[in-house]
Amino acid sequence: MTPKVLAQLDQLDADLAQLLDRLMQEPHSVLVHKLSPERWSAYEVLQHLMLSEAGSLRYLRKKSQGLSQMKKAGFRAALRSWLVTVTLKSPLKFKTPKGTGVEVFSPVESFALLSGQWQKQREEMRQFLSELPLEIFEKEAYRHPRGGMLTIGGMLQFFKVHFERH
């Protein structure tokens, strides 16, 4: 894993730990409450973010088997990553990609269970990324549903901006 990717992962984990610490103080009734019928509860936002990261990791696991077919990342991948970042920082609303919205959310039994699942998922991602050959970090290895092919660093940047958006 490259030092830049390691720093991105460390920041993602620190941000997650801070959020989970804050939410742990809230009663269950607050975490399931929706401000309006079309808005998501805190639990639903957490599930959406987890599902998004899990789907991205599944894609990367599959695609990492074909390293020789991946294109070397260049200006276009950097531009796509920038566009994803700018778009997510804008006030525009987007439909969630299939498999990351309310249609797949499940009832949350406890905050501890949900937070434990997300932390475990992050640990698995860190382990997986640490086992990848260094050359993959220079390739267009990840396909964002709207933004197209990005590097792994671009994927982690998406995770950060997506997390901040919600």
Language-model region placement:
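Short, helix-capping/interhelical loops that line the mouth of catalytic, cofactor-
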Residues: M1-A7, R58-G116
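An N-terminal domain-cap segment
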Residues: M1-R39
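Exposed alpha-helical structural elements
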Residues: K4-A7, Q11, Q18, A78, ...
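Short amphipathic alpha-helical segments with heptad-repeat character
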Residues: L6-D13, L46, M50, A112-Q119, ...
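Hydrophobic alpha-helical core bundles mediating ligand binding, dimerization, or RNAP-core interactions
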Residues: L16-L19, S56, W118, R122-M125
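Short alpha-helical hairpin
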Residues: D21-L31, K93-T100, E135-R143
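Short, contiguous alpha-helical
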Residues: V32-T87, E123, Q127-H166
